[in-house]
Amino acid sequence: MTSLSRDFTDKLFADYEANAKYSAIENAVTHNGLLKSIETRQSAVENDHVFSIDLTKDEVSNQKASGRCWMFAALNTFRHKLISDFKLESFELSQAHTFFWDKYEKSNWFLEQIIATADQEIGSRKVKFLLDTPQQDGGQWDMVVSLFEKYGVVPKSVYPESVASSNSRELNQYLNKLLRQGAQILRDLIAGGADQAAVQAKKEELLQEIFNYLAMTLGLPPRQFDFAFRDKDNNYQSEQNITPQAFFEKYVGLKLSDYVSVINAPTADKPYGKSYTVEMLGNVVGAPSVRYINLPMDRFKELAIAQMKAGETVWFGSDVGQVSDRQKGILATNVYDFTASMDINLTQDKAGRLDYSESLMTHAMVLTGVDLDADGKSVKWKVENSWGDKVGQKGYFVASDAWMDEYTYQIVVRKDFLTAEELAAYEAEPQVLAPWDPMGALASK
């Protein structure tokens, strides 16, 4: 190992002081902040909110201080369909309802994983991975499908937000305390020679305590409910004693098994045209595992465009914090110019960023439009976020095509847009990725 010498540091001082530009940038950044000082005008000019395909202008939702983006994105895709089908002015499905059942199922999932790894040392990487974050707010498309198919959905007016759903930090803090404590109890039981029946009985005791905690913090979810609404033509409709499952079937009416997850992960360990799953990633025990097919970016975008041309929005996962202006709602690789202003060259490619932990999937949103050039190629994309209407253009963002190439990792599209070869690859036995793989990161944050 080589230490930093005084002579070397003196040289760095001299080189910096010899460049007058650095002094000007220093003054700008220390007074205004880094990103505001190097933001480009051109990124705003190029990324206006006009799109050749524009599917919705519905009001945006707001996940507030929670990590429920994946739920919001899925429920938003349903919401647009429901507003259109039933001629509604506006409408939201309850994100808190899905949140409750996700917490409940994730608790059981975690405890079952603890039982399954009870023969491993407490310091093993997998056990440590489980205990570091027993559960959290994040998730994946296949996980939210499992929740919808088991528990249905309800209108937001039937099961509204609570303090804990809108700001989940305290909820998670104490739920994870209960789960870590439960993990110790179960591991100690198994180490002491308890049989499977005794372990499962204890797990059920723990889950009763957890269920009570969730009901007291989020509210007890309805088993059935009444619901009434008026459409844009002032026609009155109502439902009495409908279950969440029946509401999903009647008002959403989608066969979720018709949809598949497509990823773009150009790393050496994930060849294109293959299917993948992630070990230990899930929420509902017994539900189908999370599954993706990895495809090149050109094909990835082609599928997203095809679905929007057919009139349907697209759930997608990305690394939203990368080179983005949250307030203006601009996602563009040229939004900040580090090279011209600071002589800093950020040259790492998409594969390198994934391999070296610089990027991963952090946020799910909805593609609701795209601007195509004369050749049918995408120029920029309309993005429905779930951060409320005070950012972007009333909550909608715009992503440049280059940003999509570099920082988008997943879309969900109908199976019938895939070729027979692609569908066969998706349905083949998947390669199992490590629990900490970046393609599972959306569900572990």
Predicted regions and their residues:
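N-terminal regions that are enriched for targeting/export leaders
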Residues: T2-D58
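Bimodal feature
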Residues: T2-Y22, F72-L75, L88, D405-E406, ...
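Active-site nucleophile-adjacent alpha helix/oxyanion-hole segment immediately C-terminal to the catalytic cysteine
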Residues: A44-V314, V391-K394, D401, Y409
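Short helix/strand-bridging catalytic loops that position acidic/His residues to coordinate divalent metals
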Residues: D54-D58, K350-G352, E384
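Catalytic nucleophile-His microenvironment captured as a short glycine-rich beta-strand/loop
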Residues: C69, F148, D355-G388
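Short His-Asn-centered micro-motif
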Residues: F72, F316-D319, T368
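Long, positively charged binding patches that form subdomain-scale interaction surfaces
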Residues: A287-T362
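Conserved catalytic-core surface of thiol
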Residues: D373-K445
